[in-house]
Amino acid sequence: MNLCLDSLLNGTQDPKAFGRVAVLFGGKSAEREVSLKSGAMVLQSLLAAGVDAFGIDVGEDLLQRLVEEKIDRAFIILHGRGGEDGSMQGLLECAGIPYTGSGVLASALAMDKLRTKRVWLSLGLPTPDYAVLASEDDCREAAQRLGFPLIVKPAHEGSSIGMAKVGGLDELIAAWREAARYDSQVLVEQWISGPEFTVATLRGQVLPAIRLGTPHTFYDYDAKYLASDTRYQVPCGLDEAKERELKELTARACDALGIQGWGRADVMQDAEGRFWLLEVNTAPGMTDHSLVPMAARAAGLDFQQLVLAILADSREARG
């Protein structure tokens, strides 16, 4: 799966052609702080490139501001609920404003870990076995069927918020209760022991895979955004055939959900070398710790080129 840089950069040569661009960031989700950092970096890059851009920290007056500002397109860099789950995409569709990233359905699906897994499983794509937790009895049944260790996840949060690895029933019940603070729907998955990879897509192409290493139990919020000892390996260390398999699996996983524009898939590899899909992010982080800019650099794109490529692939709103 060879990259074509000319195709990635198509439509980025004239920054003025984008018109007036609103960078949407912040919001009210648990990932607000990450979104503020991502939005600041995206806005700074667009302005430096000569794009007529301005930022909006998304609040209740958003629709009024979009109308008053007479914007030509929106760069969505909201993370989590209210921005990455299809609701913002639906608002922009209704307003007739083109926007970056995936559409309403793909955004909603990818934000919902349970339904993402169901789509993948229906197509025979590999993803860890799981259970839905709504009670202590569910925890007991999941423990009996899946065994330990397990990982508990809120179904609709990103940035590893509310996630925990557990090794016994008491830990599982406590982790379920903690995750339920963030989401009424909680999943528990079989723990896959082995290296974790992340693979970004941009304008229909798959960027170089990155292998993640952390002294933390898993690649959690601190490892993603705060730690200085997280290791990123690119090239990822897989042989050519295995990396091709990983990239092809990522492409199939994203296609199954209808991902467009850009995104990032997280994948585990077990001791037998098999890959397991975890989730897809439709508006990944764009901070100095973020993975999509890192993958883009490995492909030969600097941060500004990446931002312009994402913007150039804005989805036309049907209105």
Curated annotation (Swiss-Prot):
GO terms for cellular component: cytosol. PROSITE patterns: ATP_GRASP, DALA_DALA_LIGASE_1, DALA_DALA_LIGASE_2. Mg(2+) 2 binds at E279, N281. SUPFAM superfamilies: Glutathione synthetase ATP-binding domain-like (SSF56059), PreATP-grasp domain (SSF52440). Residues 117-312 form the ATP-grasp domain. Its cofactor is Mg(2+); Mn(2+). Keywords: ATP-binding, Cell shape, Cell wall biogenesis/degradation, Cytoplasm, Ligase, Magnesium, Manganese, Metal-binding, Nucleotide-binding, Peptidoglycan synthesis. Its EC number is 6.3.2.4. It comes from the Bacteria. InterPro entries: ATP-grasp, ATP_grasp_subdomain_1, D-Ala_lig_Van_CS, D_ala_D_ala, Dala_Dala_lig_C, Dala_Dala_lig_N, PreATP-grasp_dom_sf. Binds 2 magnesium or manganese ions per subunit. The keyword DNA damage does not apply. Pfam families: Dala_Dala_lig_C, Dala_Dala_lig_N. One of its GO terms (molecular function) is ATP binding. Mg(2+) 1 binds at D266, E279. GO terms for biological process: cell wall organization; peptidoglycan biosynthetic process; regulation of cell shape. Pathway: Cell wall biogenesis; peptidoglycan biosynthesis. It is found in: Cytoplasm. Cell wall formation. Belongs to the D-alanine--D-alanine ligase family. This is D-alanine--D-alanine ligase B.
